[in-house]
Swiss-Prot record:
Belongs to the plastocyanin family. Its cofactor is Cu(2+). GO terms for cellular component: chloroplast thylakoid lumen; chloroplast thylakoid membrane. PROSITE patterns: COPPER_BLUE (PS00196). Its main location: plastid. Gene3D superfamilies: Cupredoxins - blue copper proteins. This is Plastocyanin. Keywords: Chloroplast, Copper, Electron transport, Membrane, Metal-binding, Plastid, Thylakoid, Transport. Residues 1-98 form the Plastocyanin-like domain. It is found in: Plastid, Chloroplast thylakoid membrane. The keyword Membrane applies.
Length: 98
């Protein structure tokens, strides 16, 4: 599985790393790294055609350090992801599915 931290070790409001590539069906573990409230929203305008962004998003907040959400993406292409409360601070990432 690929691990993506929600929040940098230095407290930055960021996905770490901000770009990953995965094989179709490979697990992606999103882990709250800092204890700030974060969520994982797939941008409906930045996912491959036919993908339901709402179905793969995790709108609830991960509030505690160590809380984890796992997603598996099966459709190849590029996915844009953001954290709703911190998108204005630039908390966004790109996932490429091979």
């Amino acid at each position: 599985a690929q691990i993506v931290k929600l929040g940098g070790d230095d407290g930055a409001l960021a996905f770490v790393p901000s770009k990953i590539s995965v094989a179709a069906g490979e697990a992606i573990e999103f882990v709250n790294n800092a204890g700030f409230p974060h969520n994982i929203v797939f941008d409906e305008d930045a996912v491959p055609a036919g993908v339901d962004a709402d179905a793969i998003s995790y709108d609830d907040y991960l509030n505690s350090k160590g809380e984890t959400v796992v997603r598996k993406l099966s459709t190849p292409g590029v996915y844009g992801v953001y954290c709703e409360p911190h998108a204005g601070a630039g908390m966004k990432m790109t996932i490429t599915v091979q």
